[in-house]
Amino acid sequence: MTSFLDDKQTQSFHQNGYVIVKNFFNDEETKLLQNASKLDPAIRDHLYDRKDSEGLTTKMMAWNHPDDSIYGVTARSEKIVDTMEDLLGGEVYHYHSKITAKEPYEGGAWEWHQDYGYWYNNGCLFPLMATVMIALDKCTKENGCLQVLSGSNNLGRIDHALLES
């Protein structure tokens, strides 16, 4: 098994609950994923609208089985699989894939949540899972990037509740 992370990155993952790896995929690989997200009819035709608590819209698509598309191949790639096995300490499997197409500055948001809270409700009794996020565009606080609560992986499962606006 090839390790794609150094010891400091691995330690950060276990301590903080996440690790950011810039340039994990090279420019050519990233460009292929970007083009597929915009041009592949299998993706474009299956996006659906998801409204946030303020009524703003984010387009998304989710599927459970990695297919032969570039996204399925990426999910099964040595880079992803070996990295996740290294971080989680054993064999891993694909749980689901999701594309979130959020328009910068105006698109909808995801309310604060803990992924394990969703996984638990879907039958995953232990938090022995991880999310891989591949940003295809520049993500900043100004345009609505993913934000995380460092160390929240050590809090146990946090039940989700819908908040009224």
Q: Could you tell me what each predicted segment is?
A:
Residues 1-16, 21-122:
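Non-heme Fe(II)-dependent double-stranded beta-helix
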Residues 2, 18-20, 131-135, 148:
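Conserved hydrophobic/aromatic beta-strand scaffold that supports enzyme active sites
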